């Protein structure tokens, strides 16, 4: 345990477990990345590097020490190579050889650390094209994040990499990940930090004024949040819910608001699911490790809910630098130089976590919900009785109400006669003006009456009375002429003015008259007067043949009758 100095940066003793595993994991990633960089240069160099009398050089520690001092150029300019050699356990006489080793082996790694473009940016759509080792660089970049900032921090945190019990406080350490967990509201109350203890499965934060058991207070807020969420679901217009402000004003509220806790919980779940899938997708060595896709541990209900949102690539700038450690718990105490607020950043990743620092929901290390066990066997099956009733071929309740044919179909056949089905109409009739408008209308009326007598009330039930030219019987001659003039005046958008010109007519009546009467008359005119120049039913120029339905279609007979086939054009409006 240690103390936190309010005036200057000081050491804090922290009990950290699994640091050796973190260092070993980081070393393995470093060795893999080094092989990739050496292969890109096209040069073959022996590994491990040997210096002096056959002493092996720890390239990993050499790279960390140089990068900790802001890189190769700064170390050379400030003449710090002797300090680096002393840290590695070498004599000062081996400094030139050590510099040569660094240039040959770690020069490519140095460029990758300096150039931010080489660090995989998951917000970029072209990140998948960075190379097959993008997942390795992703994890290695997070592990070296505190050491690869190119000298932006004056003091570095080396407890992660080398297992020290002293953790230096950095002025900007994990500044990008401070949004994960911070208590900035405590600064206004003057709360001071007293001690930090990290264990394998629990994180206990002891503070002086009113926050002795922080985790218990957060747990007490959970039932209240769930009750508020249930109230919103059952009664969304209840005044007790209150007014939720715009997201831009959420910073003015503390974490005690239920609606703010719900929003944070939703975002945490989305980030957790997204980063788990990205870790599986972009990991280049998943074929050699016992890594399973997270969807294997989820039931069907979760997989259905997964379709409601898309995959959101995580931003490396918002993640912590502890992804190299599986099962480790890391603490970073950071204090702003502006002395405005004191931030406590706690990153606790589970041993079986997929990506450290990506799950806000698991930072309290709550127990996993056990999967539902489905027992299989003859002792766990439902007892279903055998079906003893006979099957029914058809059931009238599924067929609806019978309308046609009627029940007394035999009596109907005797009334109508024995007309052959499919006989068709005769080619000629006994009418005086066979083939003209009056003749055609007469035969249509005969068939309509025949159908009406056969169907009975079903004729009106099927609305046959609202089909054909009978629709115009409910229209006057003046209304028909006005409808025709309206279409001629504006044929493209006459429907917009139809309600104004015919305020007493319903739209259903207007549409029925247009398709059953108006278009039929126009087609009749085109077929009989201009049979050689028919384009479509919506032509601009049209006429009419005969009067309205129910009146004499042709007023003269004999030789004075108009022979339609000899007429080229007619504009009889």
Swiss-Prot record:
One of its GO terms (cellular component) is vacuole. The keyword DNA-binding applies. The keyword Transcription applies. It is found in: Nucleus. SMART domains: ARID, BRIGHT, ELM2. Keywords: DNA-binding, Nucleus, Repressor, Transcription, Transcription regulation. It comes from the Eukaryota. Signal peptide: none annotated. Disulfide bonds: none annotated. One of its GO terms (molecular function) is DNA binding. This is AT-rich interactive domain-containing protein 2. It comes from Arabidopsis thaliana. The lineage of its organism: Eukaryota, Viridiplantae, Streptophyta, Embryophyta, Tracheophyta.
